[in-house]
Amino acid sequence: MNKPTPLVDQFQRRITYLRLSVTDRCDLRCTYCMPERMTFLPRREVLSLEELHQMALGFIDRGITKLRLTGGEPLVRRDMLELVHALGRKLGDGLEELTMTTNGTRLADFADDLYAAGMRRINVSLDTLDRGMFETLSRRDSLPQVLEGLAAAKAAGLKVKINTVALKGINEDQLSGLIAWAHGEGFDLTLIEVMPLGEVEGDRIDHYLPLIAVQDTLERDWTLVPSDHRSGGPARYFDVAETGGRLGLITPLTNNFCAGCNRIRVTATGQLYACLGGEERVDLRAALRSDEPERRLSEALDTAMRIKPERHHFAIDERGQSPALARHMSMTGG
Ligand code: SAM
Ligand code: SF4
């Protein structure tokens, strides 16, 4: 049999990083991510454990070396650990890194198992250390569980990066304190701009906070030294001289990072989105549920390489309006 060809798109970008959403469900309801009464998908529409596994193997065959499991909240999926263990067996055999983005509420139960399966680094999303604000933002009073989960992750030996969405008039005056706390714990921290994805209640644009402005404010408290660290993602990094820790800034709306894009995303229903900010997609579930799953999957990946757009189309116009893309971040996993 011929060796499978690597995934290279029409702009000669080599795709090596897959973000795979394993569920659209979540135990939190972050206001910028989903409405309180979110309608979740019927289970039959979501890929089964076997389908997720088979699909991931197909990607690894085609040169995906980094796989991030996300959601929704990946740790609310019941058979999640089985999947992590199965994929962990590919580490060193095509796969170089298996990682996860989680809200941390269930980490206390899972941290040791994740490490045992071969995971070494995880991203944990946390926007505030104030319990009341956490509850307002996520509509659940779960900060204590998240902090417990973080302690468990650290004790298990997992390297943690905190992801914080910067929100104007909400947590903007806590960002400096979050840096001090995270670096004190030995965690890196990355700030993210809120993105126009999916309809949510209230006006997300009211809370859009350009990180360029945040950087200026942070520089009053911290010495930010530009770093040439790269994570294979869109973040720019700084070393914080006072803490010795690392700060990342992800600015999808103010900065164009598409030229170096190495990633694709697949939703829990097996829709491959070639770009987080675009509508171009390929239905991998149809391929997986066909008579010839292996061949159809590989063809679908070739199609994805043909349609991956050169750049994203996010925009917030001069009136502060954004033509929100119809899908939620909990579908494509951020
Ligand atoms: N539930 C997990 C979590 O929260 O880490 C994984 C999925 S969540 C959709 C992934 C990341 O997307 C989180 O860091 C979250 O803060 C971020 N996110 C969700 N909606 C967003 C939006 N509209 N703009 C920017 N980031 C968003
Ligand atoms: Fe859930 Fe993550 Fe969305 Fe918050 S950001 S509602 S934790 S999926």
Please name every model-derived segment.
Residues N2-Y17, A180-G184, V194-G334:
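Auxiliary Fe-S-binding modules of radical SAM enzymes
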Residues D24-C26, M34-R37, L126-T128, E193, ...:
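Short, small-residue-rich loop/turn micro-motifs
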Residues M38-P42, D130-L137, G198-G202, D283-L284:
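A short acidic, helix-capping loop that chelates divalent metal ions and anchors anionic groups
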Residues R29, C33, R77, G132, ...:
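Residues that scaffold the ATP/ADP-binding catalytic core of kinase and kinase-like folds
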Residues L28, R131-G132, N256, V282:
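Glycine-centered loop/turn positions within well-structured domains
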Residues V46-L69, R77-I192:
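Radical SAM/AdoMet-radical enzyme domain recognition
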Residues E73:
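Conserved G/P- and acidic residue-centered "switch" motifs that form tight phosphate/ATP-binding loops
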Residues Q10-E50:
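Canonical Radical SAM [4Fe-4S] cluster-binding loop centered on the CxxxCxxC motif
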